[in-house]
Structures are given as structure tokens and as C-alpha cells.
């Protein structure tokens, strides 16, 4: 366990990005997939389970967390929307180098954890 001293504002910004946003993404992905053909769940593998594990958190607790840090959570969502739009744009415009660069940057960050 690492202990880091931060200001309250910096704490809120950090946890909005590294805790709250991942939960929102996992929950949103599950909500999206819940609207698909139910038999798709039978085909789900470890990747989907790994990606969505945190969506199993208590919705009432997460409602409180998200509302308590609303301003920073909204900023994190806005930032992520930009990333998703960039990836979509590269795919849509068939910009292979940009798509690879986007995926490589994600891999490098993940590998650094």
C-alpha cells in the first residue's frame, strides 16, 4: 500500500480518473451489453469478465461516490469522450498509424501499472 499526501482537490481529481471513471466505464459497458441478445453472455470470456468486474459494486454506494465528486467525475468523462472519439475517428477514417498509436499508448500505460 502506498500513502501519498495530496490536497483535497487533487485527491478528487485523481480518484475521479483512476477509480470512478473505470467504474463508470465498466458499468456502462454492462448496461450496454444488457440490451443485446442474452445468449451473447454464454460466449463471454475472461476479457469481458476482467473488464467489467468492478461493475459488480453496490449501485447505491457508487451513486453516493459519483454525486459526491460530481464535478471531477464529469471532467473525467469529458476527457475520456475525447479519447473514444479519437479512436473512432482513426477507425472511421482508416488511419492505421493513428489507430495503432492509440492502442500502443494504452498498452504502454497498462504495462507500466
Predicted regions and their residues:
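Interdomain hinge/lid region at the active-site interface
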Residues: 39-109
Amino acid at each position: 500500500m502506498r500513502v501519498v499526501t495530496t490536497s483535497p482537490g487533487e485527491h478528487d481529481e485523481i480518484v475521479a480518473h483512476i477509480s470512478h471513471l473505470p467504474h463508470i466505464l465498466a458499468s456502462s459497458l454492462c448496461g450496454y451489453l444488457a440490451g443485446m441478445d442474452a445468449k451473447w453472455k454464454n460466449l463471454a470470456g475472461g476479457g469481458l469478465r476482467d473488464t467489467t468486474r468492478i461493475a459488480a459494486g453496490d449501485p447505491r454506494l457508487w451513486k453516493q461516490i459519483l454525486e459526491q465528486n460530481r464535478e471531477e467525475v464529469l471532467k473525467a468523462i469529458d476527457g475520456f469522450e475525447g479519447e473514444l472519439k479519437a479512436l473512432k475517428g482513426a477507425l472511421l477514417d482508416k488511419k492505421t498509424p493513428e489507430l495503432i498509436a492509440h492502442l500502443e499508448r494504452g498498452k504502454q500505460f497498462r504495462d507500466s501499472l
